[in-house]
């Protein structure tokens, strides 16, 4: 019989993994790993401001992440620095500002390690409602913009010529990423959120034969990583958040073995066979 805290942690972790997987695919396709790091680092500033103003932490982290992402878009248009340089400036500036603000909160007892590396075992029923409610909304919006976002990812100019508005789609995607970071912050902490976005998607890439399958497999791999990580944390008394990331790393290492390519070849073979029956049956009837 599982303890209540473990069950809540598992339900919350799976909820985050189901959303982080598909979003992580676009982060990999668009090479936005450092962008994810920037938003996750800015989450600490959101936490500090929420504690200072005594308001909801999740909502504040979400708003700060959106603000930082829009600030990045603005700086990219006006500044002469490269995107990597701007991301580095924003990531480390917001992280440093967050730590400085927390240092001034002498009247508040702050669990800094919990914010940095997660405290999934302290997930409450309210957290579960936030994770699953926000996750469902994020997936619904992502499915709505999937084709447009994928078209922009593949060929920006062609997508623009077809009437798609890349700026609007990119802003919507940025808001989705910010929402995922806000709800998953308690799972693995602000320093490891990007790992939960990238590793399952990178693992799924080795097994998938289409973008949609990659998103599905990434969600499954993320869920498996959560289950493995929590079990390992319970068995060896290790931090839950880092344990989940280590489990995701093990899944990625397994994906580097040769058999994922064999699975992809077999899947393609089954797909080709499935496309043949009409002609084969006609030949059989004629004979």
Language-model-detected regions and their locations in the chain:
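Transmembrane helix-bundle core of multi-pass membrane transporters
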Residues: 4-8, 79, 87-147, 175
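Membrane-interfacial amphipathic/re-entrant helices at transmembrane-helix boundaries
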Residues: 1-18
């Amino acid at each position: 019989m599982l303890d209540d805290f473990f069950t809540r942690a598992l339900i919350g972790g799976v909820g985050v993994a189901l959303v982080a997987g598909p979003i992580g695919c676009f982060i990999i396709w668009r090479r936005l790993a450092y962008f994810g790091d920037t938003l996750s680092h800015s989450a600490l500033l959101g936490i500090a401001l929420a504690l200072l103003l005594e308001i909801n932490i999740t909502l504040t982290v979400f708003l700060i992440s959106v603000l930082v992402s829009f600030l990045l878009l603005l700086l990219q248009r006006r500044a002469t620095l490269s995107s990597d340089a701007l991301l580095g400036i924003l990531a480390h500036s917001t992280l440093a500002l967050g730590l400085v603000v927390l240092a001034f909160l002498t009247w508040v007892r702050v669990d800094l390690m919990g914010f940095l590396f997660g405290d999934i075992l302290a997930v409450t029923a309210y957290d579960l409602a936030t994770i699953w409610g926000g996750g469902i909304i994020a997936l619904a919006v992502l499915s709505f913009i999937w084709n447009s976002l994928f078209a922009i990812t593949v060929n920006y100019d062609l997508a623009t010529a077809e009437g798609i508005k890349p700026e609007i789609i990119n802003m919507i995607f940025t808001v989705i990423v910010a929402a995922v970071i806000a709800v998953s912050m308690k799972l693995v902490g602000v320093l490891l959120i990007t790992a939960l976005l990238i590793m399952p998607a990178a693992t799924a890439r080795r097994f998938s034969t289409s973008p949609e399958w990659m998103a599905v497999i990434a969600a499954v791999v993320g869920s498996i990583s959560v289950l493995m990580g929590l079990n390992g944390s319970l068995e060896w008394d290790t931090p839950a958040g880092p344990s989940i990331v280590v489990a995701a790393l093990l899944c990625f290492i397994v994906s580097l073995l040769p058999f994922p390519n064999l699975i992809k070849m077999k899947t393609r073979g089954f797909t080709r066979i499935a496309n043949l029956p009409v002609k084969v049956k006609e030949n059989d009837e004629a004979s």
